[in-house]
Amino acid sequence: MKFAYRFSNLLGTVYRRGNLNFTCDGNSVISPVGNRVTVFDLKNNKSDTLPLATRYNVKCVGLSPDGRLAIIVDEGGDALLVSLVCRSVLHHFHFKGSVHSVSFSPDGRKFVVTKGNIAQMYHAPGKKREFNAFVLDKTYFGPYDETTCIDWTDDSRCFVVGSKDMSTWVFGAERWDNLIYYALGGHKDAIVACFFESNSLDLYSLSQDGVLCMWQCDTPPEGLRLKPPAGWKADLLQREQEEEEEEGDRETTIRGKATPAEEEKTGKVKYSRLAKYFFNKEGDFNNLTAAAFHKKSHLLVTGFASGIFHLHELPEFNLIHSLSISDQSIASVAINSSGDWIAFGCSGLGQLLVWEWQSESYVLKQQGHFNSMVALAYSPDGQYIVTGGDDGKVKVWNTLSGFCFVTFTEHSSGVTGVTFTATGYVVVTSSMDGTVRAFDLHRYRNFRTFTSPRPTQFSCVAVDASGEIVSAGAQDSFEIFVWSMQTGRLLDVLSGHEGPISGLCFNPMKSILASASWDKTERLWDMFDSWRTKETLALTSDALAVTFRPDGAELAVATLNSQITFWDPENAVQTGSIEGRHHLKTGRKELDKITAKHAAKGKAFTTLCYSADGQSILAGGMSKFVCIYHVREQILMKRFEISCNLSLDAMEEFLNRRKMTEFGNLALIDQDAGQEDGVAIPLPGVRKGDMSSRHFKPEIRVTSLRFSPTGRCWAATTTEGLLIFSLDTRVLFDPFELDTSITPGRVREALRQQDFTRAILMALRLNESKLVQEALEAVPSGEIEVVTSSLPELYVEKVLEFLASSFEVSRHLEFYLLWTHRLLMLHGQKLKSRAGTLLPVIQFLQKSIQRHLDDLSKLCSWNRYNMQYALAVSKQRGTKRSLDPLGSEEEAEASEDDSLHLLGGGGRDSEEGMLAES
């Protein structure tokens, strides 16, 4: 159970590329993030990443009208049919080409994909089990260039497709007699979006140069006639239909022409252009990049390359308002079902914004790190994660909601290290700009800035257990600087290393600082002995990372030769080592001239972290794998693959030999480069950053790893973002001291006999959460103390761990608080003797209770202030203010408190009762 971690959420990245979608209720946004999809619940303020991944970056997402199914298509043309209800993959399909967009029909029976210069219509998967969920119905030809956008009529009879050849094509979903296809021109640039009017065949088309054309149809939707068969064609058609019913997979091809024949024009549907509007006025050349149209309110939203968006009312083209929301191009726009919220995605900076246009306020405003993340740290209670990136920003994330609630931008260069103090309210960061800064999470400000006498670049930072001493290692001067948190003064400069400082770590229990350097040494510094070198540990290679065990009795060091060595800091003796070269499994980059096997000799672990109990260690580095080792046995317990995204570099061990030519690798030729801003050439020798090009494949790597203090999850900063892996107790069956006589039936039989202690013990041995919940909730509140006193000490820890996990999902707050209080009061002394092993469980319990305390305290304070205000207003109603005050302010406050207690009906006891009821 300890190693059964699974991917649970993706933080740090909110949008990459692709189209945004609102769910049917309009309260959630579905955003593609790399090769994953994240759902942002705007009503409950929570984000959740689906537990699935595509082989390449997601390019487009199509949502069914009922909101239960989604089709996710990646850059390689592979599609996943996903159930949003059970969050699982139902079907895999390959479209054999790059797909630009996908759209379901309003009735949910069919969907259309634009692939190359054609549009293909498929039968949507039904509710019954099918061998092939995607059955091709028709293929539509006509455009000469790539098709870009799709829109359906409300009755699902027709759909319109826009193309890069500046034409718009209207196709019939059925065999209509008066409408097979219709080509519309009128534009001088590629079509970005096209939309039908509500319950009409009238449509709007928008091009990239900022031109809107309004087209009127002379036929209503009810005027479409099915094409009747005649003569021998009817017999042939009937025979073909019978064959289609037998085979079930035959498709129809419809080929359109830009200039139809004269006999095809008679009695057909005709379009005429009513108006033509221009967004760019007076020579303002601003490319239109995205658009969305709400049919019920006739609201048109357009996004431009400069980060500006316009709101217009159609068909009058009245400008409602215009606003600049970003410095980068707007890549995607979506409107929810009610038409109140508008979602914008900016792929340049990775921004996701939800704007309420009527109140002109933000519902959601999130942005990830522009460049890769470098460091992360958990708060002591495990509720928050702080990350630092190469863009110089420091972000604090809430692990429960998945949102970033504060961003610090004081650093002017890349952040190299972040850490929390023991209180959890101060974040200390180091940067390449030569400063170490301390941030206050109460007031969200930078209250301390530590600098060195001479400008230097800091590569790492550490804070002692008391939070009074701050130390940072220099990359260029090979020195360690020590400051006081209270005064901000420089206390000492520690010299002795002959290479850049790669890592610092304080002993959690003693005043000892460990420093790792590229000079193949590890030094221990004594804080109370004038910062003298206590020990110098000689290593076999350059040190890259260092960490202490939570109890401070062991030290782990990662070196450049892919080894992890363990040391006893008291006696300066090596206690063990792990050879991790074969566990990294590095891949071959597309620019590598050597194989992955030879390239692995230069790869190593760059980050280490002990688990909460200290029995295992987490290691990651220049690879797509994260390894968990057992410290005592020195063996690999499990290896986690952090990504399967082939859009990243160094993912595969062998390159495709068919792409290897005498001029180099054909995969390096970017097909999408040069479409908007021309061909961008990467700078030579650049290993990280934006590479001077927006079209490059970043290399997969793990830059930082941290275990949660609760021991239930661990986080990793990677090229994909901030990944969180946690224990999923709902799927796994992990019994504890199981016997053949213990069954769920025996547990329920003991509950019927009111033998609660035996029922709880058997349920804990089965270790099924629902059965344990049933056994605990069957105990009357008056007998909780009797049952807890008869529980063996071994099972108290199991009950506390279950209570901690139940606080997050259960509504029985007072009942579980009674269980927690009785267990800690009756077994507190015995549990204290095993404080080291029980620390993760206690921290997990504290985190869950603290979250409820924060939520309820805000609610109760709000209600209390409202009642005080209502009482004050009721006293002043109908009376004039007198010149002389009736009494002192203290008497007035006391009278208000008395009135409030009378209203509550019993003072503090009643308030506690109200808390328990809520």
Curated annotation (Swiss-Prot):
Family per similarity comment: Belongs to the WD repeat PWP2 family.
Phosphoserine modified-residue sites: S895, S899
Protein name: Periodic tryptophan protein 2 homolog
Subunit comment: Part of the small subunit (SSU) processome, composed of more than 70 proteins and the RNA chaperone small nucleolar RNA (snoRNA) U3.
Source species: Pongo abelii
Annotated function: Part of the small subunit (SSU) processome, first precursor of the small eukaryotic ribosomal subunit. During the assembly of the SSU processome in the nucleolus, many ribosome biogenesis factors, an RNA chaperone and ribosomal proteins associate with the nascent pre-rRNA and work in concert to generate RNA folding, modifications, rearrangements and cleavage as well as targeted degradation of pre-ribosomal RNA by the RNA exosome.
Domain of life: Eukaryota
Region of interest called Disordered, as start-end residue ranges on this chain: 237-262, 878-918
Entry annotated with the keyword Repeat: yes
